[in-house]
Amino acid sequence: MTALTASEDLSDDLQSVIFDFLGSDSGSSFDGRTTPPEKAIGRQRSGEKLSMADLRFVKSLGSGDIGSVYLAEVKRSSGGFLVAAAKVMDKRELAARDKEGRARAEREILEDLDHPFLPRLYGSAEDGRWSVLLTEFCPGGDLHILRQLQPLKRFDEASVRFYVSEVVVAMEYMHVRGIIYRDLKPENVLIGSDGHVMLTDFDLSLKSSSSSSPAFAGSPTSDITSAVSCLAPAISCFHRRLRWPRFRRRRTLPEFMSEPVNVRSNSFVGTHEYLAPEIVSGEGHGSAVDWWTLGVFMFELLYGFTPFTGESNHLWNNLKQSMKMRHVTDFDMMTLANIVARGVVFPKEPTVSDAAKDLIRGLLAKDPDRRLGATLGAPVIKRHRFFDGVNWALIRCVSPPHVPPAFKTVDFSKDVYDDSGLDMPVEFY
């Protein structure tokens, strides 16, 4: 999928710095164990300030618009090293491209996150040229690569329910914190060592000056556990089962409703195939765009492609003439035209349940005011029949459909781009 802001390669200077950090050692000192970084550098909300001398970059993991990510060894105060994902940004390039605000916003958002499905900022380091953010390393790669490994390059419905439900919980938390994600796509959903998701890449996210003040609304239910709002699921799977009375009256329990997030934007940002109609048309947008992207995300996991991918039609030319986008391809313009004017069409194959299709239709409503979740937030999405049987309070206790193999020691003395030592054809972030 084409991002609106094109990724750029690392400068030669940064490459030389990375290789300088590699040094002349014969191999990596990483022992293959995924020791939680917080044990060595602390889980402080602001992240610990480290020296560049504490870092050793050992492998390229990927690149984005404002920086590149490396697998890095972080020197432990007790001796030895631990592994982390290091996002390296060239401060001169950020200034030249007017991207300093995006880098600063991502840092502030990472500092604010405290949720099992979202990354924590473990630490940072910088000098006169480079700025580095250290977050948790996810050895399972991302959902885009994992989808490529599935039969027919798509997930079964049970797997989709698992991944979508965890994404809903993560975005619900962000909305409560006043954050609009704006960049949901399989490439940005990582798989942790336990098989659960972790959303990443927040440089396109938008944060309100103040967190949302969640309203409370009653929800009649006959099962207390089903109504728990899973903003930060942390209930142990090993507690003794509570004994509830066999007969109990229906009661009304409070639910968090954080929508809409108190911030609006007219920015044209995101990945083409995931853009909401209100972004394409330039009408201004709010948190409802995240629920649109959830619909596109769910469709892609089920069918293996996005619902509005550019095809030959007569709409895109008018749209292109009315919008000043010199760097947007005709294919992308057709995609944008489809987003604005074409309804979602479900293929005959594979067979997908009516509940899944109904949820996607609700999320892909063109009018953001009528979009599922736009006004009542995640609780109304959670109550959709597609999620029947999901215990939101114990969502972390569900067995994932895929658990990555234990991360093994790799000979990092090889070229930084040599992936031949990996057991699986996945990208690491």
Residue ranges and their predicted role:
Residues F57-V69:
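Protein kinase glycine-rich loop
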Residues Y163-V164:
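Activation segment signature within eukaryotic-like protein kinase domains
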